[in-house]
C-alpha cells in the first residue's frame, strides 16, 4: 500500500513537472518569435558607419518602451523591413542613448531618420501614418 501511494505521488509530480516544462517551452517560443519578427538592431556606431560607407539605406528609429506613438510606429516599421530587405534599421533607445541622440540632434522619442549612405535624406517625429512613413523611407532608395 505504501508503495502504491509513492508511485501515485511520483506520477503526479512528473505530470506537474511536465506541465511546467511545456509552459516554459511555450514562453521561450513566444520570445523567439517576437525577436525574429523584429529585426531592427540596437544602434552600434561601428555597424552604422559600415552601413553608411557601403551606401546603404538606413532607418534610425528613436524609440522608448513607454511611448504610445512608438508602439504605433513599430508594426509599420516592421512591415517596411520585411518589404525592403536592403533597408538597415537601427533602434536607438531614447532613455539610455543620450550621446547618440545628441549626435543625431534628436529631442523627442518616435523620431525616424533616413540616411542614404552618409547623407540624411529624411526625418519625421511622431508620425504614425503608414503612407507617410513609407514615403519617408522611400527617400533613401
Specify the residue positions occupied by each region the protein language model found.
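Typically the conserved alpha-helix immediately C-terminal to a functionally engaged Cys/Sec
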Residues: 71-83
Amino acid at each position: 500500500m505504501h508503495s502504491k501511494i509513492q508511485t501515485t505521488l511520483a506520477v503526479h509530480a512528473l505530470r506537474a513537472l511536465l506541465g511546467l516544462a511545456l509552459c516554459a517551452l511555450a514562453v521561450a517560443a513566444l520570445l523567439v518569435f517576437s525577436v525574429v519578427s523584429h529585426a531592427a538592431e540596437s544602434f552600434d556606431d561601428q555597424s552604422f558607419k559600415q552601413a553608411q560607407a557601403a551606401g546603404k539605406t538606413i532607418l534610425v528609429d528613436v524609440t522608448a518602451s513607454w511611448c504610445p506613438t512608438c508602439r504605433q510606429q513599430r508594426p509599420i516599421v516592421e512591415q517596411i523591413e520585411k518589404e525592403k530587405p536592403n533597408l538597415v534599421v537601427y533602434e536607438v533607445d531614447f532613455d539610455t542613448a543620450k550621446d547618440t541622440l545628441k549626435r543625431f540632434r534628436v529631442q523627442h522619442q518616435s523620431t525616424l531618420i533616413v540616411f542614404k549612405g552618409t547623407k540624411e535624406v529624411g526625418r519625421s517625429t511622431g508620425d504614425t501614418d503608414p503612407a507617410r512613413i513609407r514615403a519617408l523611407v522611400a527617400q533613401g532608395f
